[in-house]
Amino acid sequence: PLLDPIVGSLITFFTLLGYRFMVVDKDKRYLRKAFSSYISPNLVKQIVEDPKTLTLGGRRQECTFLFTDISGFTTMVEANHPDVLTPLLNEYIDGMIEIVFEHGGTLDKIVGDALVVMFSAPIEMADHAERGVRCAARMDAFADAYSEAQKAKGIAFGHTRVGVNTGMAVV
């Protein structure tokens, strides 16, 4: 007789816990999944904790943009078989994106070998310009080391050009 209320309470607890997981936390899981490939885990956490930080319709604010491009990429594509080039490019881009996320950047897009990165969107950052420049310096160092490592293997991997610009944008 004493176990009946305890068992009933446990069943209620686990039912409510299951409901929360299935219904209430569903939105948080969706946000994590939607943004995890584009922005750093810390920014994803902020968005999940306060989804109101995202506004639809766009707003005008100062942002820093970073652009990368591998010089001679077309020649590199023509000179190497896709089985050789694809893993190299994936490894290179993964390394570059890791650096972007370390600096709190948002990956806007990847076009072939080029990356476009934003700082201060979707969440505003007071130090976005500094983050962009520091990120660019780290990416440049990574890209130079990566290119040298590939050259040592006999693969001509082009030099990465990195550009940074700060200005007003609608985000």
Regions found by a protein language model. Give the residues of each.
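Glycine- and acidic
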Residues: 17, 77-80, 120-121
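Transmembrane alpha-helices and their extracellular/periplasmic helix-loop junctions
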Residues: 1-38
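Amphipathic alpha-helical segments that line or abut small-molecule/effector binding pockets
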Residues: 130-137, 141
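Juxtacatalytic helix/coil linker segments
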Residues: 24-111, 151-156
